Amino acid sequence: MAGKGSSGRRPLLLGLLVAVATVHLVICPYTKVEESFNLQATHDLLYHWQDLEQYDHLEFPGVVPRTFLGPVVIAVFSSPAVYVLSLLEMSKFYSQLIVRGVLGLGVIFGLWTLQKEVRRHFGAMVATMFCWVTAMQFHLMFYCTRTLPNVLALPVVLLALAAWLRHEWARFIWLSAFAIIVFRVELCLFLGLLLLLALGNRKVSVVRALRHAVPAGILCLGLTVAVDSYFWRQLTWPEGKVLWYNTVLNKSSNWGTSPLLWYFYSALPRGLGCSLLFIPLGLVDRRTHAPTVLALGFMALYSLLPHKELRFIIYAFPMLNITAARGCSYLLNNYKKSWLYKAGSLLVIGHLVVNAAYSATALYVSHFNYPGGVAMQRLHQLVPPQTDVLLHIDVAAAQTGVSRFLQVNSAWRYDKREDVQPGTGMLAYTHILMEAAPGLLALYRDTHRVLASVVGTTGVSLNLTQLPPFNVHLQTKLVLLERLPRPS
């Protein structure tokens, strides 16, 4: 009976993960500049296909090239739904949601596959808690629909972790090679540690590992070079260039640096929330030692690079969640033994509530971080579709939500050129979407009127005298200008 009950709950757990990811997607439907390449590339594959001249990356290539293999996969799975939307003449904005939703389902598929292995190794309660712990944390669910290179690699990494737990070494090596060579070369630290442990424990021999690693490396490298050289119009291995730029030249430091232990005292507590408190208890089970040490070891090695972002270590969160879930299940399984376990069980439930409250707060604040996307939506609401529109989008707007999916009027012209000088050089545009800088706005006082102002967040402060107990500070970030009629 217990087995049947556990089996009956599994669809509910899967539905929980899908529902939480959907809420994050709907509340924050727009994207940031870090997601731009993969999102724009997917758009171009869906709407331009072989017409490379229309592709965004040829005009705005970015600092280093990125692989097209991820966007190709997303476009393939998104295309049926996007085709139906086009037949219904629905806005391309909904296609953006479809594309991001497909990526989210890919991540959830990886999490669900990993959950099955957790269930097989640790039991139903640990697997159930793994799903609840993961769903209530903010960053993993928030990022799972975002077209970041790290997130595109995440489904492959999760499948590799499941193969590692199953001791399916051939599958693990092939998936690892694909993730490292195609998507994120720094994954050699994380997945390499997993392989080294297997080699050290003699679960797989060096000869057998090489028998799979060599052909996997050659085929994956050949695949990415062939596909990406076609789209970039030059012989290229994107992740090789990223490795050279970020690691050898250390140019990633241009985007800021953080202290050596930042991942441990800042990123990890924010990523795991209160679930972090249950990791020591989960270590009572010796089977959790290897996943935990390897995840922390990856973070320690990656800490040597000065430029740090939470999303860079997102692969470690599921491994640590397994240990946290084991700690939670230890208390819940012993609920009837003493009042101490009863109190501990209440703490387990309470920590999920606290994590959910933090996630809701962070999601609410994040909603205001995409003024560019909001401004594009306002433009199409305020200006009649039959109007002749030539819109200029400045850098601040392009980095905070503007994408080709939001260019929904095929008769309008949208321009992101960065070489147009402010002032008289902008008079050719009927509309301007720009940063709300007083000095720049003064240049258009006599030639344009403000059609809309869009706010964004500047910070959050605690206020215990109200509910919710915080204030979100907003200020005007972008303005949408419309050119005044010229005197006849």
Curated annotation (Swiss-Prot):
Keyword Kinase (UniProt): no
Family per record: Belongs to the glycosyltransferase 22 family.
Function of the protein: Mannosyltransferase that operates in the biosynthetic pathway of dolichol-linked oligosaccharides, the glycan precursors employed in protein asparagine (N)-glycosylation. The assembly of dolichol-linked oligosaccharides begins on the cytosolic side of the endoplasmic reticulum membrane and finishes in its lumen. The sequential addition of sugars to dolichol pyrophosphate produces dolichol-linked oligosaccharides containing fourteen sugars, including two GlcNAcs, nine mannoses and three glucoses.
A Gene Ontology BP annotation from the UniProt entry: dolichol-linked oligosaccharide biosynthetic process
Chief site of localization: endoplasmic reticulum
Entry GO terms, CC: endoplasmic reticulum; endoplasmic reticulum membrane; lumenal side of endoplasmic reticulum membrane; membrane
Membrane topology: Multi-pass membrane protein
Lineage: Eukaryota, Metazoa, Chordata, Craniata, Vertebrata
Record's keyword terms, sorted: Congenital disorder of glycosylation, Disease variant, Endoplasmic reticulum, Glycosyltransferase, Membrane, Transferase, Transmembrane, Transmembrane helix
Disease: Congenital disorder of glycosylation 1G: A form of congenital disorder of glycosylation, a multisystem disorder caused by a defect in glycoprotein biosynthesis and characterized by under-glycosylated serum glycoproteins. Congenital disorders of glycosylation result in a wide variety of clinical features, such as defects in the nervous system development, psychomotor retardation, dysmorphic features, hypotonia, coagulation disorders, and immunodeficiency.
Protein name: Dol-P-Man:Man(7)GlcNAc(2)-PP-Dol alpha-1,6-mannosyltransferase
Presence of keyword ATP-binding: no
Segments passing through the bilayer: 11-31, 68-88, 93-113, 122-142, 145-165, 177-197, 212-232, 264-284, 290-310, 312-332, 346-366, 423-443
Annotated effect of mutating residue 158 to P: In CDG1G; loss of dolichyl-P-Man:Man7GlcNAc2-PP-dolichyl mannosyltransferase activity
One function term, GO molecular function aspect: alpha-1,6-mannosyltransferase activity
Documented EC number(s): 2.4.1.260
Reaction catalysis annotation: an alpha-D-Man-(1->2)-alpha-D-Man-(1->2)-alpha-D-Man-(1->3)-[alpha-D-Man-(1->2)-alpha-D-Man-(1->3)-alpha-D-Man-(1->6)]-beta-D-Man-(1->4)-beta-D-GlcNAc-(1->4)-alpha-D-GlcNAc-diphospho-di-trans,poly-cis-dolichol + a di-trans,poly-cis-dolichyl beta-D-mannosyl phosphate = an alpha-D-Man-(1->2)-alpha-D-Man-(1->2)-alpha-D-Man-(1->3)-[alpha-D-Man-(1->2)-alpha-D-Man-(1->3)-[alpha-D-Man-(1->6)]-alpha-D-Man-(1->6)]-beta-D-Man-(1->4)-beta-D-GlcNAc-(1->4)-alpha-D-GlcNAc-diphospho-di-trans,poly-cis-dolichol + a di-trans,poly-cis-dolichyl phosphate + H(+)
Pathway connected to this protein: Protein modification; protein glycosylation
InterPro entries the record matches: GPI_mannosylTrfase (IPR005599)
Record Pfam families: Glyco_transf_22
Localization (cell): Endoplasmic reticulum membrane
